[in-house]
Amino acid sequence: MLNEIKNEILCVRGNCDAEVDQMVLQFPIMADYAVLEIDGRTIYATHGHIYNESNLPPLRKGDILLHGHTHVPKCAIHEDYICMNPGSVSLPKEDTHHGYMILENGKFFWKDISGENVGKYHE
């Protein structure tokens, strides 16, 4: 399923991902983090077991920390940064949907596994 949209996916390694997982995928998943610069704002994407709201990576005012690990979707707007969690496609927790996040036209959308919008995170 994911290999079909491999050119549209940005993934970072989770705390349970291994090299054997990478062998069946046609897009990279083994990076510890990814840094994107979009519209003058930095998005720091990481799994969240190392860098998270309690242990921040180097961020500037207005930057976005995007992490998973808890498998619970979230958007927390702090004074200096925004923290977002897309939840989990495979193992959602706290009665949340199987879901993922997309960035489209400067907005983050949380979608369920069928592709339906469940929420908008940031404008």
Question: Where in this protein do the model-derived segments appear?
Answer:
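Conserved beta-sheet core of the metallophosphoesterase superfamily
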Residues: 42, 49-119
